[in-house]
Amino acid sequence: MLMPYRRARYDILLLSLVSFSFFLLLQAAPVFPDPDSFYHTKIAMLMREQGIVKNFPWLQMTVLNSVFADQHLLYHLLLIPFLSLGLPPIWGVKLATAFFAWLAI
């Protein structure tokens, strides 16, 4: 018979595994549900290769044309380890999404 605190640990571990598996299942489609995901993926890949992105010339028709600011800098930094796992970029971001969702609970 397990002691109550050991039982609680197993329950937490089981809940963690089930919830992470559920979040992975939600990411199972081979597409991104939102087109912004491609932007975030590419910025994180550029940051991995070149460092902090200070110029982004592909935004000619936006207010960010003359002065680019990465409004999601920390998110892009958090994506870099997942994009460095050797998986295709789309799967690295999907794994990161499931991991961040799991951390939120």
Tell me the role of every PLM-derived stretch:
Residues L24-Y39:
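Helix-to-loop transition at the C-terminal end of transmembrane segments
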Residues D11-L15, P88-A96:
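Membrane-interface starts of transmembrane alpha-helices
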Residues M1-L25:
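Start-transfer (signal-anchor) and selected internal transmembrane alpha helices
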Residues L95-I105:
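Transmembrane-helix motifs of polytopic, lipid-linked glycan transferases
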Residues K42:
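Mature N-terminal segment immediately following signal peptide/propeptide cleavage
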Residues T62-P88:
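Short hydrophobic/aromatic helix or loop-helix immediately within or flanking a transmembrane segment
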Residues M45-S66, L74:
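Extracytosolic helix-loop segments that constitute the early lumenal/periplasmic catalytic or substrate-binding loops
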